[in-house]
């Protein structure tokens, strides 16, 4: 009887380990895809309310080579 309980617990732990590993890998894939989309996107202008020198310098538009290196409405 003890052997069956131990075997059941080990089986459950193994299944949970597999599920957690699969979810972590899926999250990694989603992070890579989202990161790629974020790198590819470029906003046309920065809203006037968020328009500071720091925001202009570090905006997606400024950092990406294929975007214009201006700050839009600043």
UniProtKB/Swiss-Prot annotation:
It comes from the Eukaryota. GO terms for cellular component: extracellular region; nematocyst. It is found in: Secreted; Nematocyst. The record marks 61 as: Key residue for binding both Kv1.2/KCNA2 and Kv1.3/KCNA3 (occludes the channel pore like a cork in a bottle). Residues 42-74 form the ShKT domain. Disulfide bonds join 42-74, 51-67, 56-71. One of its GO terms (molecular function) is potassium channel regulator activity. Keywords: Cleavage on pair of basic residues, Disulfide bond, Ion channel impairing toxin, Nematocyst, Neurotoxin, Potassium channel impairing toxin, Secreted, Signal, Toxin, Voltage-gated potassium channel impairing toxin. The record marks 46, 50, 59-60, 62, 66 as: Important residue for binding Kv1.3/KCNA3. Residues 23-39 form a propeptide. Residues 1-22 form the signal peptide. Inhibits voltage-gated potassium channels (Kv) with higher potency for Kv1.1/KCNA1 and Kv1.3/KCNA3. Belongs to the sea anemone type 1 potassium channel toxin family. Type 1a subfamily. This is Kappa-stichotoxin-Sgt4a. The lineage of its organism: Eukaryota, Metazoa, Cnidaria, Anthozoa, Hexacorallia.
